[in-house]
Amino acid sequence: MNSEELTHKAEEEIAALISKKVAELRKKTGQEVSEIEFAPRETMKGLEGYHVKIKLL
């Protein structure tokens, strides 16, 4: 697999995980997700990950 295929596969997996978590939140809280914010978490070595903030209606 080349880097483009790997990137596309990772994007699909992340999108599926987000959809699953949104559905879980909707079921457990009875509220809709109105917004998801991703803020990069960086170190001197580069991008380490993301802080995620979810807002409900």
Curated annotation (Swiss-Prot):
InterPro entries: Gns. It comes from the Bacteria. Pfam families: GnsAB_toxin. Belongs to the gns family. This is Protein gns. It comes from Salmonella typhimurium (strain LT2 / SGSC1412 / ATCC 700720). The gene is gns.
